[in-house]
Each structure stands twice: as C-alpha cells, then as structure tokens.
C-alpha cells in the first residue's frame, strides 16, 4: 500500500511538473528526407554525439523533444517534401511551415510557384533563407521577388546571419564567405520593406552579435532567434551569453526568440532549453518572454 502511494505521488508530481513547464515556441527547427542522411554513419557533433540515423528516426526524436519540453509551436524548415511529411504526422498542430533555401532557384522555385505555395499555406515562414551559403545576400536583386510576395501576404522572413559549418566552403558550400553573414547586409531589405516581419537567425553568430544589436536598435520591426548558439559549442554559448547580457542592458530583449536549430541532433533541443534556463542574469519573466511571448507576438498568434 505504501509503495502504491509513493508511485501515485511520483506520477502526480511528474504530471504537475509537465503542466507547469513554460510553453515554448521553437523558431528554428530542421526537417529532412532520407537523401539528406545517405548510407554513411550518423554525423557527430562537437561533443562526439551521434545524430539520428535516418529521417524518420530524426522526426520521431524531435517530436518526442517537443512533447518533453512543452514546445507548442515550431517553425520547421527543410525541403518541401520533408516539411509536409512532418505536418501529416503532426497530430498536435505544432508545425509552422517553413522552407530552407540557399539560392532563389532551390526546389525548382520561382516567384510564381512561391506565391502559389504561400496562397496554399504551404509556406508560412520564408526561411530559413540562407543566402550566405549560396554566395549572395538577401539584399541582392535575385531575392526581391520573394520578399515582395512576403510583404504582400504578410509572411515572416527568417534569414541566416553569422558564419556556418567550419570547412564547409571546401566541401558542400563553396560559395560561402564569412563576410556574407554580417547582419548589416540585410539593412537594405529593412529599408525597402518596412512592413516586412523579419528575424535574424543566430543573432549574428559569433562574428557580429553587436551588429545584430545595433540593427535591432535602428529597426524596431527586426527580431532575432538564438538558434544553434545555445548548444553547438562552448564558444557559441559564451557569445550568446554575452549577447543576452548586452541586449538586455540595451533594452531590446523583448525581440529575442528561442530557437534550437537541432539539425540532425534532436537532443540539442533539450540542451538549448537547459542552457537558457541556467542563465541567472535573466529573470523568470525574461525567460518566459524568450521562450514564448516574444515569438507569439512576432507570429501574431491568437490564443
């Protein structure tokens, strides 16, 4: 009898803990198809942790993290096939459809196809846009037809800032150059499309966190996520800690949003949540705002 009471207490405690967790919106999640994994061994991260073995395992593990950490919405970018596969299996309606594009013609895309996908609600966020990897910037003329459509239909834009995969220029992204990750390179977009909802991904990375803050100071419509910075390496964690301290002091913390950028390592979602929660210079309200409130405002979510 005593054992049963203890078990009941533990179950009730776990249930209460799950219900009391802060709601989270993850503004930076990636989806994949099996072609992204191939037959090779799972990738290892900086810490030697192996990623998911295939696309379905990756989805299942990511969905489990959504449940565990009370992630109620997630902006998912990948190729359109992978995103739609996730949506079809998303019984809890968490997924916000994004699209991963390095170049304007990825996925055989053009402005006509793009606009139709927007109308059909197959694209709800234009991102992750990552011109950095394709050797361009979002301010270049080749991206303007898409941005005009986003402004017309009030579609948020998510743009990669900061650097990328170390050594990637020698392999899968030969056109990538570090200078292309400077947040200042999107300033012309902010000027040209003042009504556009836009957020930086990675908060300028390790390279330009101060540029990210200055840009947010000048352009009040600009937000940022913290994706990848919260988990991928000790150095990024150092930079994001300084970024959060500085942007809080500057008064723009209300435009900072949580993002994990789990890539092929779903465990990174929990690691990102835990690291943000460990920062004692942030108040509980600060954390609530970063985890949920700021993104809910940016996305114009209705309760």
Show which residues each predicted segment covers.
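Active-site gating loops and adjacent loop-to-helix segments of metal-dependent hydrolytic enzymes
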Residues: 33-57, 94, 165-169, 220-223
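Active-site gating/metal-coordination segments in enzymes
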Residues: 81-168, 175-177
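Mid-to-C-terminal alpha-helical segments outside catalytic/metal-binding sites
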Residues: 2-3, 19-30, 36, 45-73, ...
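Sec-dependent N-terminal signal peptides
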Residues: 4-13
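Hydrophobic faces of well-ordered beta-strands that scaffold small-molecule active sites
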Residues: 25-29, 74-76, 95-100, 125-128, ...
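Mid-chain, structured segments of secreted extracytoplasmic proteins
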Residues: 62-94
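Catalytic pocket-lining loop regions of alpha/beta-barrel enzymes
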Residues: 124, 139-257
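Active-site environment of divalent metal-dependent phosphoester hydrolases
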Residues: 32-34, 80-84, 104, 132-134, ...
């Amino acid at each position: 009898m005593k054992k049963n009471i203890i078990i009941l207490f533990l179950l009730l405690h776990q249930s209460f803990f799950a219900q009391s967790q802060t709601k989270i919106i993850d503004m930076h999640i990636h989806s994949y198809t099996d072609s992204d994994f191939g037959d090779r061994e799972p990738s290892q991260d900086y810490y030697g942790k192996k990623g998911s073995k295939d696309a379905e395992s990756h989805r299942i593990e990511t969905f489990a993290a959504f449940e565990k950490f009370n992630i109620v919405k997630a902006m998912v970018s990948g190729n359109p096939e992978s995103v739609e596969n996730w949506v079809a299996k998303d019984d809890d309606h968490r997924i916000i459809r994004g699209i991963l594009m390095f170049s304007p013609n990825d996925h055989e895309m053009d402005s006509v196809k793009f606009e139709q996908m927007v109308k059909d609600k197959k694209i709800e966020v234009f991102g992750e846009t990552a011109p950095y990897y394709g050797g361009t910037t979002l301010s270049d003329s080749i991206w303007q037809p898409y941005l005009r459509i986003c402004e017309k239909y009030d579609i948020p834009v998510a743009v990669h800032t900061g650097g990328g995969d170390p050594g990637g220029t020698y392999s899968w992204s030969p056109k990538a150059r570090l200078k292309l990750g400077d947040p200042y390179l999107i300033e012309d977009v902010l000027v040209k499309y003042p009504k556009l909802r836009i957020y930086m991904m990675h908060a300028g990375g390790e390279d330009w966190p101060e540029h990210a803050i200055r840009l947010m100071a000048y352009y009040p419509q600009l937000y940022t996520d913290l994706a990848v910075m919260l988990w991928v390496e000790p150095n990024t964690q150092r930079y994001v800690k300084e970024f959060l301290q500085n942007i809080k002091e500057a008064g723009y913390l209300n435009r900072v949003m949580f993002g994990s950028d789990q890539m092929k390592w779903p465990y990174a979602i929990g690691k990102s949540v835990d690291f943000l929660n460990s920062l004692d210079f942030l108040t509980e309200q600060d954390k609530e705002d970063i985890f949920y409130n700021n993104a809910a405002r940016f996305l114009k979510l209705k309760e």
